[in-house]
């Protein structure tokens, strides 16, 4: 039995060392985005290669600022006017593989992540932030990061093998300008059927 322990340890260690390491997300300012296996430029817009979803160049008054690739087929585009560091609202629009999860399971996972990351509690949908789409799951929360209070929400749908998700975040209490800008950005997002991919 004792001789089996070193062998088991060595086998486990070799499996651990041979396992692929999760890469860090790759964040690129929009002006520097080049075509890749995950996203391609489409004029001023960005096309998600796997799903064919088109990320617009702006959402309302919020221009696209950066593209993040989290892994194969897992892409987000960040939209903001002044940026979170300047106390402004921002919206992140995601397209990523749905895997084997239902949209209800995905929505539960999103809500748990928000609750854990922001120490957040469920809140009412802010006025003007209502959105409709087939199969839509959504939620809004009040939370904090350090000393700053935020109001943050998500909208998620499953389209075929893909999840489309909006994450909207505003300082809390939001100014009328931030609320209006964020509402316009959320309203501008297309959560309808995906285009036919080539």
What are these regions (language model features)?
Residues 8-16:
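Bacterial N-terminal signal peptides
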Residues 119-157:
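Signature of long, low-cysteine stretches enriched in small and polar/charged residues
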């Amino acid at each position: 039995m004792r001789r089996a322990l070193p062998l088991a340890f060595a086998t486990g260690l070799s499996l651990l060392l041979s396992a692929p390491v999760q890469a860090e997300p790759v964040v690129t300012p929009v002006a520097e985005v080049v075509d890749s296996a995950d996203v391609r430029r489409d004029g001023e817009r960005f096309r998600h290669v796997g799903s064919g979803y088109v990320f617009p160049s702006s959402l309302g008054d919020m221009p696209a600022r950066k593209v993040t690739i989290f892994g194969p087929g897992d892409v987000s585009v960040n939209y903001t006017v002044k940026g979170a560091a300047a106390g402004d609202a921002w919206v992140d629009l995601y397209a990523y593989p749905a895997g084997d999860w239902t949209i209800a399971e995905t929505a539960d996972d999103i809500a748990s992540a928000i609750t854990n990351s922001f120490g957040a509690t469920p809140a009412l949908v802010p006025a003007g932030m209502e959105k409709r789409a087939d199969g839509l799951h959504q939620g809004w929360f009040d939370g904090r990061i350090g000393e700053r209070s935020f109001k943050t929400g998500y909208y998620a749908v499953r389209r075929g093998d893909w999840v489309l998700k909006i994450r909207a975040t505003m300082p809390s209490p939001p100014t009328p300008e931030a609320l209006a800008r964020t509402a316009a950005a959320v309203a501008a997002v297309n959560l309808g059927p995906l285009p036919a991919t080539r």
